[in-house]
Amino acid sequence: MSRLFLAPMEGLADYVLRDVLTDTGGYDGCVSEFVRVTGSLLPARVYERETPEILAGGYTRSGTPMVIQLLGSDPEWLARNAAYAATLSPHGIDLNFGCPAKVVNRHGGGAMLLTNPELLNRIVASVRAAVPAHIAVTAKMRLGVSDASLAIDCATALAEGGAASLVVHARTRDHGYRPPAHWDWIARIAAAVDVPVIANGDVWTVADWERCRAVSGCADVMIGRGAVSDPFLALRIRGLMDGSPSDQEWPLVLRQIATYLKKLHARIASCHEHGRVKLWLSYLKRTWPQAAELHAAIRRMQDSLEIERVLEGLPGAATAPE
């Protein structure tokens, strides 16, 4: 059976949304937003804040294993931080070689590292040597910066450095998130390396998942924004829910939104809560027209309690008990 993973999504899939989405079900694992590593050893409180799953043995509340993702460009400091992070009960250490954000790339991190296969190899080898053998070290990459000319060289460098598996987002950095994802390139990479490759990019529906697997040749798939747009996508892929979204599911989505807002109360400042809910609704609009109506209704609201009252007034929005 194909495995399904919830992707790391910086600025989108924080701990609270990871908790809500994995609680919905269908995922074999999830990866945290990246933890940025510079020239210091990060203390436990950073991981407790960014990856609270470590306080529960490395699992989300639903029991989904969580992998900590690190982002940086210095092999020594990444290795030191990975060695410490490995003591905190994650189910693996993932290395970010795909972030397209300008602020990250400006400092030589994320996708910018795809210009230097030799450095990629040194980073993975250093981290692999520093982390106990029973903890997997994995990597997530894009196809390159402006083109895919070094894609196979980079993937080979990562695999030879000791990465247990590779997630390949089938776009370059400059491609951003614009469609289409080039799943055929994932197939080329998978044929060139001796480690498992997990396909990623543009999986919004069950049909997309089927096409992605067929074109890439990969059994396993990592889902990102498609999971945010349709929280039931993993269950649809597994055949546990209808293959296409329906109006009958909207009350379930409302309950998820209400639960999400409730959980945000305990995690972030109230002045930021409204923005997170609106951000999620902006993705849900792709799947449910009702989300567009709700987004329009709360668009100017900045008080999360006011948004909560709107949700409470909608049929089916009552949250499930904790």
Curated annotation (Swiss-Prot):
Which residues are the active-site ones? C99
Q: Where is this site: Interacts with tRNA?
A: R36, N96, Y177, R276, K278, Y283, R299
Q: Which UniProt keywords apply?
A: Flavoprotein, FMN, NADP, Oxidoreductase, RNA-binding, tRNA processing, tRNA-binding
Q: Offer an example of a GO molecular function term for this protein.
A: FMN binding
Binding annotation for FMN: P8, M9, E10, Q69, K140, N200, G201, D202, G224, R225
Catalytic activities: 5,6-dihydrouridine(16) in tRNA + NADP(+) = uridine(16) in tRNA + NADPH + H(+); 5,6-dihydrouridine(16) in tRNA + NAD(+) = uridine(16) in tRNA + NADH + H(+)
EC number, as in UniProt: 1.3.1.-
* Cofactor section: FMN
Instruction: Write down the Pfam families for this protein, in alphabetical order.
Output: Dus
Q: Which cysteines are joined by disulfide bonds?
A: none
- Alphabetical list of InterPro entries matching this protein: Aldolase_TIM, DUS-like_FMN-bd, DUS_fam, DusC, DusC_C, tRNA_hU_synthase_CS
| Keyword set includes Membrane | no
Keyword tRNA processing in the entry? The reply is: yes
Principal EC category = oxidoreductase
The source's domain of life comes to Bacteria
**Function statement:** Catalyzes the synthesis of 5,6-dihydrouridine (D), a modified base found in the D-loop of most tRNAs, via the reduction of the C5-C6 double bond in target uridines. Specifically modifies U16 in tRNAs.
Family designation: Belongs to the Dus family. DusC subfamily.
Protein name, entry field: tRNA-dihydrouridine(16) synthase
| Organism annotation | Cupriavidus necator (strain ATCC 17699 / DSM 428 / KCTC 22496 / NCIMB 10442 / H16 / Stanier 337)
